[in-house]
């Protein structure tokens, strides 16, 4: 009996040693509103139950492919083109493990771009995508590994990403965690663990990562409050106000664009498509822009049944002094505008006012490295971010450096330690911590003679932080000039 016990213990120790030398791989396809991205992660799995350590995967390779799946609504069979490019990329990167392709899972998770489609179009795209991956991919794949995830899932995964990169997962029941505001093109997510003495009365998303670690997360997604959709809704509102004056040659003023700049607004979605040709001209008035943007957030017309509410009657726990990361387009746009990562909303307001007062020619001169669309939309974009955070979500306009203020501090960034902040890492963190030991055992058995560390990193430039020099230093130093009158808008 003792000899058998010794043999079993020796086997367990040998197995544990094997795990320390082996890497497990997974593939995540992020099917977003603007494009699809494939990200390959690796981690060293824990084989015993109950799990005591939260597994944090490492990004190995990544590639972005355009357009997004929603672009194939009229021709779903064409999804094979971006999917083939994605699968071929993963096959090449993971070539050292070609003998165990069938044990490496691939997950596709689609977000707001597909959530916003009519059901028949969404179903057709997903059906063609699942069929193609099933027939073409050599990796482990079942139909239920391709999903259109809810906005709340997206928000919860983003929260996991932020707190993993900040190194605070698994510490003191959530008190030390960060919240996240993730602003996409079509939607916006807010996720955080409220202060311990508060309840999550709605939109509760429990996350269990180990037997010792469970978080009661508040996660809420706002469809049509992404930065692209908000731009379309703003134009629709302004046109509606002027509808009696409009014909195909009328020009309507839009305060969220530079003075004198003429353009035709984009109404690419069915929800906000307007069957007339309209020209707009910018007036570059930050205060009026904020007033127009506030109308996107219904504060008075909807009953708040569960206090407290943000807008559209949506419950949100008190923000208190929770630290937040402003990610996605929040971090990206404010970095372009020259707002420091750790700054105050008062400074955001000052920079927005200054940018909106410039001409389009001045913007092109200050930001020569940015795309034409980014240049044209910068006044709108930073004004929308400011209005969303203050009027929409209720963050306080104060100097966050003042320790006497009980503030919700926001760090504006799209990257933490050079890793892009998005939901994909969080999704694979959750998946890694739910993985059955039997799957790991099968993988370890078949990779016993393989070097699982032979996979070489290959990361697309779009996944790396950009060193933006144009405009940044000037705006940091001159964001709030001495004696300047800053519009006092809330």
Predicted regions and their residues:
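Helical "lid/coupling" subdomains associated with nucleotide-phosphate turnover
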Residues: 26, 40, 62-99, 107, ...
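Short loop/turn segments immediately following beta-strands, especially the blade-tip
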Residues: 43-48
